[in-house]
Amino acid sequence: MRKNAFVLVMLLLASTLLCACGGEQNETPTTTEEPTVDMMQKIDPTGDGVVNILMIGNSFCRYFTDELFAIARAAGIEMRICNVYAPGCEVNTHWAWWKNGESHYKLTTTDITGTRDIEDCDLKFCLEQGDWDVISLQDGSPCVRKTSGEEAFNNNKTYISDLISYIRKEFPKANLYWQQTWAYQVGYDDEGYKVADAEEQKGYAQRQYVYATSVCKEFNLYRINSGEAWQIVREKYGYDNLCARLDKNEGLGDYYHDGDIGGGQYLNACVWFEVLTGQSCIGNTFRPTYELSEEMIEMLQKAAHEAVENLNNAEA
């Protein structure tokens, strides 16, 4: 009798220990799990099962949409991404074109059916193309080249306020975001602005940070801190080649766009994915068609994840 009781106690103890260990394992984030109901309610407030995203910006939000779509699909999340693009467009120009109804945008849609473009659109038309869950804004990259982050914010505060008020009136359910863009690569020398070394680059990134955080605080927007992830790659991993090459089909090379070969497009997509969904990008199974080594992919995933963790801690 005592022997049976002893065996029963030992079995119960072993079961408890196994459950505890299993619980710890289940806490590890994975991108292969199906998104939870709570998560989908947050990122899909319109409830149609697809995260509908409208990015209003310029080339700094143009080139990573395919990667973002594919990373999300690998995690079991369907997205429809529409990019409102005009080259080098700054927020005051977005405002002026909206006020005057000017049709200067290219609207690029990426979804389960593929990618397609509509030329010569105005902002009102672009906004009418979906019931948006996510709408993002950003300024042109030169906005803090020759001014502080505080000055850039004050110079553009009225334009941003008007645009956000209009968007919120038209899409009250949508979550609004501001993308914090990145500093140019060391070696950039154009229009009198030079990034001669890592210190100048770091200062430029800090001005972008101040501008973005000021906008988000003033207008209650979520921040997508792409620029912070870039600085982590540069400062922690010693890699400053993210701008190495733009889209291969366009054949452009420069010191400021997110390049495919350099990994900038993949890095940006990882940051956006984590900020929008709350899921870790670490371990995501999507691999780009351009050549990135597994070591590079692991580094970019870690940098994106660290940046978003910093963001979450700062805004907790």
Label the model's feature ranges.
Residues 1-7:
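Positively charged n-region of N-terminal signal peptides that target proteins for export
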Residues 17-20:
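C-terminal motif of bacterial Sec signal peptides marking the signal peptidase cleavage site
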Residues 24, 219, 245-316:
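Conserved catalytic region of serine esterases and O-acyltransferases that act on ester linkages
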Residues 25-47:
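N-terminal, intrinsically disordered, polar/charged segments of Gram-positive cell-envelope systems
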Residues 50-52, 80:
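Residues that mark the start of a beta-strand
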Residues 54-56, 179:
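Short hydrophobic segments within beta-strands
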Residues 63-157:
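Conserved SGNH/GDSL esterase-like catalytic core that processes O-acyl groups on lipids
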Residues 121-262, 274:
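Alpha-helical cap/lid subdomain in secreted, periplasmic
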